[in-house]
Design a protein with these regions (language model features):
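Glycine-rich phosphate-binding loops of nucleotide-dependent enzymes
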Residues: 1-242
Length: 242
């Protein structure tokens, strides 16, 4: 059953068509990958899903209801949380206070939930430290804890492996699968690291110049000639041209 559906979504920026009639489903309980070259429209799709952008046409349906009637601040309460390509945190606030921003409730219950999420991502020992000066990989875990404390049904991860080395990327893949299982949620993943996407995704969607050019299992996508030409021609594990 589809938890999320984009239905013929188009989004323009002046004369540039960032998304051109894009349609795809994300099945509940799965990890789905959304891939494509730089500028393909992946982050724009995330921004449409989370209502930061309104599509020029088409619809976004979540749990059977259109999201286009929801305000931006209502998306988290609908059950969608996300991380960003560039980490978005309050640098003068502590790890705990940053995670509390994502909590639905306030007071003692919220603090307990936030500490539980912080502990889950392995940062309990620095919960009271300001995030300024923390390593980039740690900041990404803080952002992930903030997303998890909201109790989402759908978790959007925008390039979570950015800045990580090979061993850290492998660990991240296992962690994303663990999150899916432990929190019983669905994951939509935008990522340039092909080994990560193909290794953990149940289904992969491929964008190129704002159009959906392929969808299927990792094996099907890897074998698709259009994908090979557009994106997977390199074999360095990153999907980037040398």
């Amino acid at each position: 059953m589809a938890l999320l559906s984009l239905r013929n979504v188009t989004r323009r920026f002046g004369g540039v068509v960032a998304l051109d009639g894009v349609s795809f489903d994300v099945v509940e309980g799965q990890i789905a990958g959304l891939i494509g070259p730089n500028g393909a429209g992946k982050t724009t799709a995330f921004n449409v899903i989370t209502r930061l952008y309104t599509p020029d046409s088409g619809d976004v349906v979540f749990r059977g209801e259109s999201l286009l009637r929801s305000p931006v601040h209502g998306i988290v309460r609908r059950g969608i949380a996300r991380t960003f390509q560039n980490v978005e945190l309050f640098r003068t606030m502590t790890v705990l206070d940053n995670v509390l921003v994502g909590a639905h409730t306030r007071g003692r219950d919220a603090t307990g939930q936030a500490l539980e999420a912080i502990d889950y991502v392995g940062l309990r020992q620095i919960a009271e430290r300001p995030v300024a000066g923390l390593p980039y990989g740690t900041l990404k875990r803080v952002e992930l804890a903030r997303a998890l404390v909201a109790g989402p049904k759908l978790l959007l991860l925008d390039e979570p492996a950015g800045g990580l080395n090979h061993e850290e990327v492998e660990e991240l893949g296992r962690f994303i699968q663990q999150i899916r299982d432990d929190y019983e949620l669905t994951v939509l993943l935008v990522e340039h690291h092909m080994n990560l996407v193909m290794g953990i995704s149940d289904h992969v969607h491929v964008l190129n110049f704002g159009r959906m050019i392929a969808q299927g299992t990792p094996a099907e996508v890897r074998a698709n000639p259009d994908v090979i030409e557009a994106y997977l021609g390199t074999d360095d594990g990153t999907g980037r041209d040398a």
